[in-house]
Swiss-Prot record:
It comes from the Eukaryota. This is AA9 family lytic polysaccharide monooxygenase B. Pfam families: AA9. Lytic polysaccharide monooxygenase (LPMO) that depolymerizes crystalline and amorphous polysaccharides via the oxidation of scissile alpha- or beta-(1-4)-glycosidic bonds, yielding C1 and C4 oxidation products. Catalysis by LPMOs requires the reduction of the active-site copper from Cu(II) to Cu(I) by a reducing agent and H(2)O(2) or O(2) as a cosubstrate. In addition to cellulose, also cleaves the beta-(1!4)-glucan backbone of tamarind xyloglucan, irrespective of substitutions which contrasts with AA9A xyloglucan cleavage activity. It catalyses: [(1->4)-beta-D-glucosyl]n+m + reduced acceptor + O2 = 4-dehydro-beta-D-glucosyl-[(1->4)-beta-D-glucosyl]n-1 + [(1->4)-beta-D-glucosyl]m + acceptor + H2O. Keywords: Carbohydrate metabolism, Cellulose degradation, Copper, Disulfide bond, Glycoprotein, Metal-binding, Monooxygenase, Oxidoreductase, Polysaccharide degradation, Secreted, Signal. Lignocellulose is the most abundant polymeric composite on Earth and is a recalcitrant but promising renewable substrate for industrial biotechnology applications. Together with cellobiose dehydrogenases (CDHs) an enzymatic system capable of oxidative cellulose cleavage is formed, which increases the efficiency of cellulases and put LPMOs at focus of biofuel research. Residues 1-25 form the signal peptide. The lineage of its organism: Eukaryota, Fungi, Dikarya, Ascomycota, Pezizomycotina. Its cofactor is Cu(2+). Belongs to the polysaccharide monooxygenase AA9 family. CDD domains: LPMO_AA9 (cd21175). GO terms for biological process: cellulose catabolic process.
Length: 371
């Protein structure tokens, strides 16, 4: 077996074990709201939370073959969140993900849709989403993406609710699009997450939106793209950013968002203050301050988030797992083969050792919200 095949098997297995992520909760004005924990799927009477439920218990994705189907809206067979988190227009919400694999690089995008009534009963296929936040390629020279910023910010992302939108009930659609297999048609992996918010105050804007089933096409330049080449720019998928969105509203490690649908590579920024472990939910701000927060929900999500790993394997192109669409095509296989064959035996062994160490010994809980 060739070096490339051996490395592909090892790193592909690592991707399967590491899994993907989902939004476990949100922090608003110092208060923690549980999202939909995957363990709730097996409960006869799960807690009422702001996060929409989903059948994606394998932490899987939606690919381009389902862009016209309802699953792309809020994930597979998603059902409405039962309650809403109240937030004033102009305020920030911190969205907390479970551990996200570094190999799954791509943009982070956030939308809102006015429910025009109760979000607990709204028909998701009728929701019209307008984009309030986006970030894509950070640096083409070292292949740094918005997802890397999210990881370095303790797997969290902060979004500002536009101050100009009208008060009302909104569904937030927050999403990472993983591009590690996107060199192949339908290889991009969408991980949409939906949460309910009651927006207070604000202005009078009621932005026009786009149905969730019309947000993307599988041939969009930001969807069908080879990220294993040096990119000088990247076009973020989806409709244009809402004009009332705050510039710099999002925060991975840099705390800025692109101001147009097309994002151009810029210098990578440093990470925020290092996270700490507590027995309660913790809001990680983009400054040195770390604030304790209270927990809302009949049962807090029993989710733990992995601290950023130093694994070299996670930052290199990995062989797609069995869940990845189009992983066997010649395009991505050639890219991976060239990369692995360029490594010396010692370098390859080091990549494998660090991957196994990350999987077995280095996993720690960066947040504990199960107090």
């Amino acid at each position: 077996m060739s070096i490339a095949k051996i490395a592909g098997v090892v790193l592909g297995s690592a991707a399967l074990v590491a899994g993907h992520g989902y939004v476990s909760g949100a922090v608003v004005d110092g208060q923690y709201y549980s999202g939909y924990d995957m363990s709730y799927h097996y409960m006869s009477d799960p807690p009422k939370v702001i996060g929409w439920s989903t059948d994606a218990t394998d932490l899987g994705f939606v690919d381009g073959s389902s862009y016209a189907d309802a699953d792309i809206i809020c994930h597979k067979n998603a059902k409405n969140g039962a309650i809403s988190a109240e937030i004033a227009a102009g305020k920030q919400v911190e969205l907390q993900w479970t551990d996200w694999p570094e190999s799954h690089k791509g943009p982070v995008i956030t939308y809102l849709a006015n429910c025009n009534g109760d979000c607990a009963t709204v028909d998701k296929t009728q929701l019209e989403f307008f984009k309030i936040d986006e970030k894509g390629l950070i640096s083409g020279s070292d292949n740094t993406w918005a997802s890397d910023n999210l990881i370095s910010s303790n797997n969290s992302w902060t979004v500002t609710i536009p101050s100009s939108i009208a008060a009302g009930n909104y569904v937030m659609r927050h999403e990472i699009i993983a591009l590690h297999s996107a060199g192949n048609k339908d290889g991009a992996q969408n991980y949409p997450q939906c949460l309910n918010f009651k927006v207070t105050g604000g202005g009078s804007d009621k932005p026009e939106g786009t149905l969730g089933t019309a947000l993307y096409k599988d041939t969009d330049p930001g969807i069908l793209v080879n990220i294993y080449q040096t990119l000088s720019s990247y076009t973020i998928p989806g409709p244009a950013l809402y004009s009332g969105s705050s510039s710099g509203s999002s925060s991975g490690s840099s705390g800025s968002s692109s101001a147009a649908p097309s994002a151009t590579a810029s210098a990578s920024a440093s990470a925020t203050a290092a996270p700490v472990q507590t027995s309660t939910a913790t809001a990680y701000q983009t400054s040195t301050a770390v604030a304790s927060v209270t927990v809302t929900g009949s049962s807090p999500a029993q989710t733990h988030v992995q601290a950023t790993s130093s694994s070299a394997a996670a930052s290199t192109p990995t062989a797609s797992s069995g869940a990845s669409s189009g992983s066997g095509s010649s395009s991505s296989s050639s890219d991976l083969t060239d990369y692995f064959n360029s490594l010396s035996a010692d370098e390859l062994l080091n990549v494998i050792k660090q991957t196994l160490s990350w999987l077995v010994t280095d996993k720690i809980h960066a947040r504990d919200i199960s107090a």
